[in-house]
Amino acid sequence: MKEEQIKQIVEQVIKTFEEAQSVPMEVPVEVSARHIHLSKEHISLLFGSEDQLSIIKELSQPGQFQYDKRVTLIGPKGSIGNVAILGPSRDETQVEISYTDARALGIKPPLRESGDLQDTAGIIIATGHKAINLEGGVMIAKRHIHMTPKDAEVFHVKDGEHVKVRIESKRPIVLEDVLVRVNEKYGLSMHIDHDEGNAAAYQPGTTGKMIK
């Protein structure tokens, strides 16, 4: 191979690398307030049937929505009312709260990825007239980024990878150990809880810059 050809190849590699580095690594950030995903069984026990629930708002993730009804969480130390119910229903009930919520309720839920319910905390879930004792299912959700496979290619990450994200706000902070979740059905968005949002002085429209 001639020296000129080698030079052209090296220049192309450098150009490709620089272009990759120049790709904006920003993602929209959303604060995920305390909420619950109910199983069909628990919807029936609390409300009679799923027909009693109406969708009032579509969420940023395709196919996800909020119902019109709310529940109260009751723990050994206190209770938290007006907790949103998100749909669609799941195979198992899952409750996502913050560390501040956990202290107010008097429980010690683990930090988990959504869907990992083994050895999670219990809680009483109540409506105006009915209540169920959930033996497990309460967690503090790990901060994470939803993205499509195409997004993952652009950001040079893969499903299950952990990254750092600098929250671009009036009170910028760097969040480590942010889980990347990749699926065709997802929409690009980073989810943090209220504790993390308050620490960063979050406001709607806040973005995060991914740090590899």
From Swiss-Prot:
Localisation: Bacterial microcompartment
Catalytic activities: propanoyl-CoA + phosphate = propanoyl phosphate + CoA
Known cofactor(s): Zn(2+)
Classification via Pfam families: PTAC
Pathway membership: Polyol metabolism; 1,2-propanediol degradation
GO biological process, one term: propanediol catabolic process
Documented EC number(s): 2.3.1.222
Manner of cofactor binding, per the entry note: There are 2 Zn(2+) ions per monomer; Zn(2+) and CoA bind inbetween the 2 domains in each monomer.
Disulfide partners: none
Binding site for CoA: 31-33, 77, 198
Residues that hold Zn(2+) 1 according to the record: 35, 37, 96
Positions of Zn(2+) 2 binding: 144, 146, 191
UniProt keyword terms in alphabetical order: Acyltransferase, Bacterial microcompartment, Metal-binding, Transferase, Zinc
Gene Ontology CC entries for this record: bacterial microcompartment
Database matches in InterPro entries: PTAC
Residues at which phosphate binds: 90
GO molecular function: acyltransferase activity, transferring groups other than amino-acyl groups; metal ion binding
Entry remark concerning the domains of this protein: Formed by 2 beta-barrels, each is capped on both ends by short alpha-helices.
Primary role: Involved in 1,2-propanediol (1,2-PD) utilization within the bacterial microcompartment (BMC) dedicated to 1,2-PD degradation by catalyzing the conversion of propanoyl-CoA to propanoyl-phosphate.
Family designation: Belongs to the PduL family.
Name assigned to this protein: Phosphate propanoyltransferase
